[in-house]
Curated annotation (Swiss-Prot):
Signal peptide: none annotated. This is ATP synthase subunit alpha. Belongs to the ATPase alpha/beta chains family. Produces ATP from ADP in the presence of a proton gradient across the membrane. The alpha chain is a regulatory subunit. It is a peripheral membrane protein. The keyword Ion transport applies. It is an enzyme of class 7 (translocase). GO terms for molecular function: ADP binding; ATP binding; proton-transporting ATP synthase activity, rotational mechanism. It catalyses: ATP + H2O + 4 H(+)(in) = ADP + phosphate + 5 H(+)(out). It comes from the Bacteria.
Length: 512
């Protein structure tokens, strides 16, 4: 077989013409030090603050310090296999987490990977962990309530959809219990819940998951976990990841509730990272941007307008408003709310629910101090019937607490003072509530009506709990339609008032 030189030449030219040169440049550097999850990198000239940096073995770090010659980055996870001299490169992206409806009912880590031993999760896309909060024009006023199921909160410290309400108190005062009960109470409301556990013991988190399962509330909840045994970088990231998952529901025109348990441990994790990055420490050794750490997180919680939802979904969803309601938790030391992190978060949020260890230890659960607890925007969102019936409760409690303090110094009290003290004690007893037992709007309305209209005067304090339990059973058995109507419309009128009086009179005459 003879080879034709012309054909060979033609074939070579065709192959050369078809050859494509792929020229892809990378911004590459090398690790010069590794310690405590922090790496120092030399040679990254075009890195962005917060950018993901690709490490060996497909691990990632986030650039947090940009200096003249080096970049300080925090490794997202284990760092044992990382060594000095290893090559790293920029990705040009900020960190994103997977989001979607399929995450409901699952337990995931701070990066969105399932850790509950079940199947992998099919996501509906990725959202950035660091996102801008909606602007003033994109927001809508808070005018719809979130029912916690607690009489003392829904009546005196109401929470609205899109609000940020701080839960603050010493350890072991019922902060997490209050948050979990709020999630349990949302299983019929359609509000999607995200519980972010930061720096908690795994045994505590397992108990939370178990309680939500027992109360049929896990199907509506995403649990994001960065436990005490995990790296500080993941504890720092977890709240932002949870918020990104909540934004997925908000952008669809749905309401979501997110609980950060707790931001004190989040601040400690960030302090640890900052000190390892050699940032200058300030008050209580926290870095200078500790306020911004929490403000940029909590400002993402809001109620957005129909136009915002329409714009962000490119007209796929119209006529709906979305919201993120945030319940951050802060742990205080010996009731000191004037510490650095508590005062920061108090100034960012729209109110606070203060839990006192003295009240908790004396058997008042939830241990809410109504004197210094406040909701700055929730009253506009409060259900009409609860708003009308609870107006005198706070005043009566405030008078009772003032008189109770005064009566310790005087043994000779007049009849009016003694009557006010007795009434205050009965209201305090009536507002007590067991854990994992949230109650409906109608049940709250009936109990508040009893307290407001002096139907407790002839009942001794030790029988208040029994009276409350039995009157609710009686109401559901004989006035079921009335209770359903109140739950549906949430309004108060003369007809409902007359029916309440009839119900209470009949019950006290025949049953109690």
């Amino acid at each position: 077989m003879r080879l034709n030189s012309t054909e060979i030449s033609k074939l070579i030219k065709e192959r050369i013409a078809q050859f494509e040169v792929f020229n892809q440049s990378y911004n590459e550097g090398s690790i010069i030090s590794v310690s405590d999850g922090i790496i120092k990198i030399n040679g990254l000239s075009n890195v962005m603050l917060g950018e993901m940096i690709l490490l060996p073995n497909n691990e990632y770090a986030i650039a947090l310090n940009i200096e003249r010659d080096t970049v300080g980055a925090v490794v997202m996870g284990p760092y044992i296999h990382i060594s000095e001299g290893a090559k790293v490169r920029c990705t040009g992206k900020i960190l994103e987490v997977p989001v979607g409806d399929n995450f409901l009912g699952r337990v995931v880590n701070a990066l969105g990977f399932p850790i509950d031993g079940k199947d992998s999760i099919q996501n509906d896309g990725f959202f950035p962990v660091e996102a801008d909060a909606p602007g003033v024009i994109d927001r809508k006023s808070v005018n719809q309530p979130i029912q916690t199921g607690y009489k003392v909160i829904d009546s005196m410290i109401p929470i609205g959809r899109g609000q940020r309400e701080l839960i603050i108190g010493d350890r072991q005062t019922g902060k997490t219990a209050l948050a979990i009960d709020t999630i349990i109470n949302q299983k019929q409301s359609g509000i999607k819940c995200i519980y972010v556990a930061i720096g908690q013991k795994l045994s505590t988190i397992i108990n939370v998951v178990k309680k939500l399962e027992e109360n049929n509330a896990l199907f509506n909840t995403i649990i994001v976990v960065a436990s005490a045994s995990e790296a500080a970088s993941l504890q720092y990231l977890a709240p932002y990841s949870g918020c990104a998952m909540a934004e997925f529901f908000r952008n669809k025109g749905e309401d979501s509730l997110i609980i950060y348990d707790d931001l004190s441990k989040h601040a400690v994790a960030y302090r640890q990272i900052s000190l390892l990055l050699r940032r200058p420490p300030g008050r209580e050794a926290f870095p200078g941007d500790i306020f911004y750490l929490h403000s940029r997180l909590l400002e993402r919680a809001s109620r957005v307008s129909m136009e915002y939802v329409q714009k962000i979904t490119k007209n796929k969803i119209t006529g709906k408003t979305g919201s993120i309601t945030a319940l951050p938790i802060i742990e205080t030391q010996s009731g000191d709310v004037s510490a650095f992190v508590p005062t920061n978060v108090i100034s960012i949020t729209d109110g606070q629910i203060f839990l006192e260890s003295n009240l908790f230890n004396s058997g008042i659960r939830p241990a809410v101090n109504p004197g210094i607890s406040v909701s700055r925007v929730g009253s506009a969102a409060q259900t009409t019937i609860i708003k009308k019936l609870s107006s005198g409760i706070r005043t009566a409690l405030a008078q009772y607490q003032e008189l109770a303090a005064f009566s310790q110094f005087s043994s000779d009290l007049d009849d009016t003072t003694r009557k006010q003290l007795n009434h205050g004690q009965k209201i305090t007893e009536l507002l007590k509530q067991k854990q994992y037992s949230p109650i409906s709007i109608a049940e709250q309305a009936l109990i508040l009506f009893v307290a407001e209209n002096n139907f407790l005067d002839d009942i001794s304090i030790d029988k208040i709990t029994k009276f409350e339990k039995e009157i609710l059973i009686y109401a559901h058995n004989y006035y079921f339609d009335l209770m359903e109507e109140i739950n549906k419309i949430g309004d108060f009128n003369i007809v409902i008032k007359d029916k309440f009086i009839k119900l209470i009179t009949e019950f006290k005459k025949n049953q109690f």
